[in-house]
Amino acid sequence: MTAPAKRPSAGPPAGPTRNDFAERLLKGSVKKSYAPVVDIDWDAPLDPDKFFLPPKTVSLYGTPLWDSMSREQQIELSRQEFVNTLSAGIWFENILNQALLRKMMHQDPTAPATHYELTELGDETRHMVMFGKAIDRVGVRPVRPRRYQRMIINLLPF
């Protein structure tokens, strides 16, 4: 009786699977997570002479109007634009979270990829808390999408 012939290799060994990759991402994400509610000193005093954004990133910077503004007005504009940016960040994070949750409705809840997505969902939620607390701390009302915009957001297919 002869030994069966060896089949030629189909190529190099397969690399990491999707689950292997998800496990690695999950472990890395957990190590880098933080809790902004406890990790940031929300009671620290704000420096009244400090910009909320780098001046060069403020919309009017470098214009004659910017040059005609007092430092206090420039700081206030940076404060308003900071809050606008954080407000937009909250709503983009919210859209991402909705998309992740909708996707996970169709996934295996025991899969490493699902666990990683849940970790990401938690991180995005903590970002929203951090942005909201920062907005509250600087004392400016957040910018919210109008009702019709929220309805459109809820109709997005992802």
Predicted regions located by residue number:
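Terminal targeting/low-complexity segments that flank the catalytic cores of oxidoreductases
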Residues: 1-101, 105-114, 137-144, 148
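Alpha-helical transition-metal enzyme core signature, strongest for iron centers
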Residues: 89-93, 97, 120-135
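Active-site metal-coordination segments of metallo-dependent hydrolases
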Residues: 117
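Active-site-adjacent scaffolding segments
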Residues: 128-158
